[in-house]
Amino acid sequence: MLLDQLVHHAPQFRVPLLKAAFLFLLVGYGTKMGLAPLHTWLPDAHSESPSMISALLSGAVLNCAFLAILRALQVCAAAGQAQFCQKLFVWFGLMSMAVAAVFVLGQTDYKRMLAYSSVEHIGILAFGIGIGGAATFGVMLHAINHSLTKAALFFVAGNILAAYKTKSTAQVRGIFHVLPASGLLWVGGFFAITGSPPFGPFLSEFTILKATLDQGHGAVAIAYIALLALMFIGMATIVLRMAQGRPSSEVKTIQPREAVLAIMPPALLAAAVLVLGIYIPPFINTALHDAAQTLGGL
């Protein structure tokens, strides 16, 4: 059946069977999108895949699974079971953020660090959908911001791996000296992905936070902020150490050259994220509002 037909006939569905179906879909697609505790494949896949594939996984594949779950939410909402689904989204979202924050602390592989960051941001998307209302617009915007930012970071991670020949955070020092352009994008991408102004993720994460507070969910909002802060601290410890310090003599001897084609893709993505933090083009704004209204937000 087409989705429109499912939505039309949803009030006639048996509620216990509908809830069971949604749970199965949440487990299946939740695994594909990396929701904790179904996320275990994601760090392994990201750390072992070529950087371009990792960028595609985080930027597109995870979002596709998320959109599939949103389609299931539409059917449940039409049957009057939106609140049941939203509670699950909130708890799975916070769990994903918590798991990501814990595993990022002391992480020794910078590509796995980025993978756990994806788990966190998938959790943010789920959390925002669970809150609903104006947060739904923030979720739609955040899906774009995360895709652009994470793709840029994985491209830069590929440049770092090509120069240093290792994924170990302990063996990568002095990126600013060895790869100046990549170092700038690496640190800038870190601030963007952790929701620092003036980048796009700050705007979308703040929109979700404001909607949470406006609906009177103070305790949940505090947990949301605390987990964001913990993730910032964990990633800052790794990223800033990699960017600063003195590179090893072996890397100095090699003196890797930064090709224009290796810098332009992440630079363009980073520029787009910066623009979205300052100004949302009307066509994107309209599309996001329409998507949010379709899901019952705004």
Language model segments and positions:
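Cytoplasmic/organellar membrane-interface segments at the starts of transmembrane helices
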Residues: S49, L179-A181, F232-L298
